[in-house]
């Protein structure tokens, strides 16, 4: 697959005042992926929420990547796994850059095991999109 472009759809950075804002996990990542009907193009959307209890920071972001697909077999899984692996560093970088505008302490979200994230995500479904806006 080849990444054609990516778009940051939403990014939020805030200082946390209330303890109830903190989640049990520091990092939550969700993935959605889809293909055009002809399976030549794909889209992956990553959403991440990161909570830094020590520094009272919360960052959330949603980013989408648009891909050209050049494999024919198992393209649904291919776009979900490889598309996520390609896009995730862009998400990490955007979160880090936004957090450095506030202080010298950049928020660095950890790397992930893509297969583990996809296996553990209950609502994750591969779906075919009949129209993919490019």
Residues covered by each model-derived region:
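N-terminal intrinsically disordered, cationic/polar leader segments
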Residues: 1-86, 93-134
